């Protein structure tokens, strides 16, 4: 199958590029091996903000009495339902991204794309057993979690942000380790 442009990666950069390319009249294909929407939609911005909203509602309910609002004693939460709501929000938005990309006329291939070479000026890509030939290639692979090389870390049970978003129960305690942003590092 021949295309004018292929985009590898279905995060914000990739799906926006696919929409714009297709809207501009280019025969467009976009490949995503995990989940459309990238880290922001699936493991970052959206799910964390959805969980944060539930936490804010709980906090507001606990402090409602000082505003003259009576609430029952023993306000509690159901973590399973909170996680389920987060999953539904992510699923809805992921579906919206897929539909939008397709509505512009881009073809979405939910398989890993492998660049196999070039032939007669066309870039060769293999995905899901199918061959694709493209004139232009845009690689938008996004980001992934980096596990720091801390001695002994592999000997303990630890979570990355991905596991934290899927927790089945709250831990009794935890230690958060984050790295500074590149901007913060340049200030030191």
Language-model-detected regions and their locations in the chain:
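Glycine-rich flavin
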Residues: 2-3, 19-26, 31-170
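Conserved small/polar residues in nucleotide/adenosyl-binding loops
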Residues: 177-184
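N-terminal Rossmann-fold NAD(P) dinucleotide-binding loop
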Residues: 14
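Glycine-rich Rossmann-fold phosphate-binding loop(s) that bind the pyrophosphate
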Residues: 10-11, 33, 179
């Amino acid at each position: 199958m021949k295309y004018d442009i292929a985009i590898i990666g279905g995060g914000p950069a990739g799906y926006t590029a696919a929409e714009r390319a297709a809207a501009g009249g280019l025969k467009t294909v976009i490949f995503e091996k995990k989940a459309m929407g990238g880290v922001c939609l699936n493991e970052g911005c959206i799910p964390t903000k959805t969980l944060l909203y539930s936490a804010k509602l709980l906090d507001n309910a606990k402090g409602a009495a000082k505003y003259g609002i009576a609430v029952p004693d023993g306000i509690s939460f159901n973590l399973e339902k909170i996680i389920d709501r987060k999953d539904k929000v992510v699923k809805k938005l992921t579906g919206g991204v897929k539909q939008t990309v397709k509505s512009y006329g881009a073809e979405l291939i939910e398989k890993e794309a492998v660049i196999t070479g070039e032939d007669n000026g066309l870039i060769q890509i293999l995905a899901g057993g199918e061959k694709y030939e493209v004139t232009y290639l845009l690689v938008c692979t996004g980001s992934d979690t980096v596990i720091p090389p801390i001695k002994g870390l592999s000997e303990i049970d630890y979570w990355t942000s991905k596991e934290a978003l899927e927790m089945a129960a709250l831990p009794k305690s935890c230690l958060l380790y984050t790295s500074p942003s590149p901007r913060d590092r340049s200030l030191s």
